């Protein structure tokens, strides 16, 4: 309910905007009386493109109806009676919605309203003003846009009044002109009269004719002056319109597209609804002025008067047609981009939208949109207006869609839900370029009829660059191409040119954005993390981040050439880190439990003076996507230990928290946080009772050289089946080292071979899963991994 409380504190223009959101489709009374229920529902969790979510939408709608009925029944008094009637009416409307195809539209409407309500509250909270109207950092520019719209409204109303005055003046002029013609006809009739009467009538007619012709000449000049003044006013209006349209289309819309280009690298861009409202206002004002200009042309044709007006009107008519064309073609945009890494034979979706679709009657004759995939060269030719009709570089299934108008939200859009790239035709590769560096784009095109077919526009828009793959193993390298393009492409570039080199700080910004978006974490890369990455990329030992600011990173360094001494590229290693965090360790990263970006020597330096049992988690240098444990424990042979890295595959078998819980001798998370305080909330609880008579087995992390004496004496069940938080303190005498019985799990550097241990775990599982009475050979466990002290399995 907190959101509605904040919404009620809005003032001024923000309050008016919020009031406009609510209407007959979702009355503000419903929002007020069901605020707590509304804000507790998962509106954003439903995928509007997934028909399988329809049941959830219907369930939400039924819940709303039930809550409304309860609220309506409890209304008393005169005011309560009126409210009861209104709520009851909405109950009836909502009940009808349940039985039709409207639930999707209903959900879309509510999401639209709640999103914009939250936006208004957020904008109000983020800023301040002397008048008490809270606005965000962009408010000044938005205020200027709204002021210009008000100015345009006033000048358009002024030219409308001037046009009406011109029309009235011209109509009266025509009446007087007809009177002049009638007088001339009367002169012809004077020949039939006698001379005396004819002379008398002729003198009166001549006086009247002279007076009328003088008036007509003056009025003709006045009319011409009115026409010129009106044309000049239209010229000034169009100048202001062009300026406003440039701000909205070339600044605001381009900025939205730029933020959209970085999708997957930062938070989603703000809603298009504000932009659409501006574009719709532009469309209304442009169309009003166009109609005025056409009426002025009609008046000139109705009563031709020699002068410059015809040429002026032809010029402003051509200008306003250009303005309309720019508005329509520029506001045909891709709201939901297709995946930038596109795998053949895989379903994908996209959404295109016309931001002025509801204001120019485009929706009265719903247009069809077609999607095709074209190459980089074909995209260049298209932007040069070269003839590329019917050229494509592949075949997309289900590539045609009719645009739909959603009356509640006022949007005209086409949702491609089931497209699939059947085949792709590649160009000849250049030099060392791989298939994952080749870029394509999805072309969306349609034809719009504006204003009852008065104008017809061919519209086209290109998606962000797309890299086509045929196998999942190509995904990582394709993502690198997409990242480099999204981050470093210049606005207005030739498709799809990108710099071959960028400065290290530029790459830092891109990596940080990508990291936060991919891991879905507010904890980004620190200066220490970036320093580690710089040292890794440049193979440099300098410990000052500023030393790298002037260095350039080439595309080859980023993802074409292996890092010195390793068999992977910089991006492949970094992408592996993001993948393992995203899939398995995101909570621990957010908690600050994973130090991550340190090498083995740095870990040694950090731990060397710490108490025994202090450990840290770092990303492996040798394994892509590997995470390893380094810990301090003094022994006759060594005092620092490194566990062999485990990757995404091992993380899916047993969680990091459970693995750490298994190792009782790991006590403190670097620098000095008790392990259980950090990780215990993530431990998997042990089932107290058997299910269906069976006891569920567990896999536990064991390092053979670190097994406590108590565990040895307790037997195998304690070692392999128990799962409990480790003690906060583990006395040193409980450690039992086995130097006389070297174990192949630890290498000479003290690294634990997890692969061999997992072989043992799988062997145990195979034994436990065998049905009773089953016979047949079973592969023996790896030698040397089970000792008598740990018990035996039978």
Swiss-Prot record:
Q: Which residues form the SH2 domain?
A: 589-686
Return the annotated region ranges for Disordered: 765-794
Q: Which cysteines are joined by disulfide bonds?
A: none
Modification Phosphoserine, positions: 129
Tissue expression pattern: Found in mammary gland and, in lesser extent, in ovary, thymus, spleen, kidney, lung, muscle and adrenal gland.
Mind telling me which SMART domains this protein's record contains? SH2, STAT_int
Supply the induction statement: By prolactin.
Keywords for this protein = Activator, Cytoplasm, DNA-binding, Lactation, Nucleus, Phosphoprotein, SH2 domain, Transcription, Transcription regulation, Ubl conjugation
Residues bearing Phosphotyrosine?
A: 90, 682, 694
| Subcellular location, principal | cytoplasm
GO biological processes: cell surface receptor signaling pathway via JAK-STAT; cytokine-mediated signaling pathway; development of secondary female sexual characteristics; female pregnancy; lactation; lipid storage; luteinization; mammary gland development
- Could you tell me where this protein is found in the cell? Cytoplasm; Nucleus
Q: How does it assemble?
A: Forms a homodimer or a heterodimer with a related family member. Binds NR3C1. Interacts with NCOA1 and SOCS7. Interacts with ERBB4. Interacts with EBF4. Interacts with CD69.
Name the record gives this protein? Signal transducer and activator of transcription 5A
């Amino acid at each position: 309910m907190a959101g509605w409380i904040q919404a009620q504190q809005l003032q001024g223009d923000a309050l008016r905007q919020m009031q406009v959101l609510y209407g007959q489709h979702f009355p503000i009374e419903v929002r007020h009386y069901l605020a707590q229920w509304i804000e507790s529902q998962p509106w954003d969790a439903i995928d509007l493109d997934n028909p399988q979510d329809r049941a959830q939408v219907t369930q939400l709608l039924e819940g709303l109806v039930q809550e409304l009925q309860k609220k309506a029944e409890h209304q008393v008094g005169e005011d309560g009676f009126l409210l009861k009637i209104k709520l009851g009416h909405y109950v009836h409307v909502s009940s009808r919605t349940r039985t039709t195809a409207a639930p999707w539209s209903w959900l879309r409407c509510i999401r639209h309203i709640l999103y914009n309500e939250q936006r208004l509250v957020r904008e109000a909270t983020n800023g301040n003003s002397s008048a008490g109207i809270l606005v965000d950092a962009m408010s000044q520019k938005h205020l200027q846009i709204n002021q210009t719209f008000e100015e345009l409204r006033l000048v358009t109303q002024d030219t409308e009044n001037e046009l009406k005055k011109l029309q009235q003046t011209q109509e009266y002029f025509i009446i007087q002109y007809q009177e002049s013609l009638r007088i001339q006809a009367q002169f012809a009739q004077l020949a039939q009269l006698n001379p005396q009467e004819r002379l008398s009538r002729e003198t009166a007619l001549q006086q009247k004719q002279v007076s009328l012709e003088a008036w007509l000449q003056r009025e003709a000049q006045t009319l011409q002056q009115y026409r010129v003044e009106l044309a000049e006013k239209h010229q000034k209006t169009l100048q202001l319109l062009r300026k406003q349209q440039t701000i909205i289309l070339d600044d605001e819309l381009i900025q939205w597209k730029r933020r959209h280009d970085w999708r997957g690298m930062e938070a989603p861009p703000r809603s298009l609804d504000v932009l659409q409202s501006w574009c719709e206002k532009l469309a209304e004002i442009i169309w009003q002025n166009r109609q005025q200009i056409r009426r002025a042309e009609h008046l000139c044709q109705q009563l031709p008067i020699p002068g410059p007006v015809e040429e002026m009107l032809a010029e402003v008519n051509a200008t306003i047609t250009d303005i309309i064309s720019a508005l329509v073609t520029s506001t045909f945009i891709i709201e939901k981009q297709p995946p930038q890494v596109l795998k053949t034979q895989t379903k994908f979706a996209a959404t295109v939208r016309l931001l002025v679709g509801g204001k120019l009657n485009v929706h009265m004759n719903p247009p069809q949109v077609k999607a095709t995939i074209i190459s980089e060269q074909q995209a260049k030719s298209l932007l040069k207006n070269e003839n590329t009709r019917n050229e494509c570089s592949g075949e997309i299934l289900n590539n045609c869609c009719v645009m739909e108008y959603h009356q509640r939200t006022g949007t005209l859009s086409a949702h491609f839900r089931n497209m699939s790239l059947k085949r792709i035709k590649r160009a000849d590769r250049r030099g060392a370029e791989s298939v994952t560096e080749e870029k394509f784009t999805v072309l969306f095109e349609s034809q719009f009829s504006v204003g009852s077919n008065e104008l017809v526009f061919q519209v086209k828009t290109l998606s962000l660059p797309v890299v086509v793959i045929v196998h999942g193993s190509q995904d990582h390298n394709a993502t690198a191409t997409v990242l480099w393009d999204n981050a470093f492409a210049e606005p207005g570039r030739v498709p799809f040119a990108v710099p071959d080199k960028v400065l290290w700080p530029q790459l830092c910004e891109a990596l940080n954005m990508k990291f936060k978006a991919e891991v879905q974490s507010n904890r980004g890369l620190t200066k220490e993390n970036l320093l580690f990455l710089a040292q890794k990329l440049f193979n440099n030992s300098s410990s000052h981040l500023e030393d790298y600011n002037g260095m350039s990173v080439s595309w080859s360094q980023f993802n074409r050439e292996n890092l010195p001494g390793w068999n992977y590229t910089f991006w492949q290693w970094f992408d592996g880190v993001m993948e393992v965090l995203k899939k398995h360790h995101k909570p621990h990263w957010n908690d600050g439990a994973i130090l991550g970006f340190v090498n083995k020597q740095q870990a040694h330096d950090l731990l060397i003076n710490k108490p025994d049992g202090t450990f840290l988690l770092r990303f492996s240098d040798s394994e892509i996507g590997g995470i390893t444990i380094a810990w301090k424990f003094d022994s006759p042979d060594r005092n620092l230990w490194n566990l062999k890295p485990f990757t995404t595959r091992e993380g899916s078998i047993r969680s990091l928290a459970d693995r750490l819980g298994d190792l009782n001798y790991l006590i403190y998370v670097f620098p000095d946080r008790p392990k259980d305080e950090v990780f215990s909330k993530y431990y998997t609880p042990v089932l107290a009772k058997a299910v269906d008579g069976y006891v569920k087995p567990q896999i536990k992390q064991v390092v053979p050289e670190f097994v406590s004496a108590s565990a040895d004496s307790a037997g195998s069940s304690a070692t392999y089946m128990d799962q409990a938080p480790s003690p906060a303190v583990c006395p040193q005498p409980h450690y039992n080292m086995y130097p006389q019985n070297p174990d192949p799990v630890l290498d000479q550097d003290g690294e634990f071979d997890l692969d061999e241990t997992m072989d043992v775990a799988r062997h145990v599982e195979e034994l436990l899963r065998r049905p009773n009475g089953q016979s047949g050979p079973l592969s023996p466990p790896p030698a040397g991994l089970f000792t008598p002290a740990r018990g035996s399995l039978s």
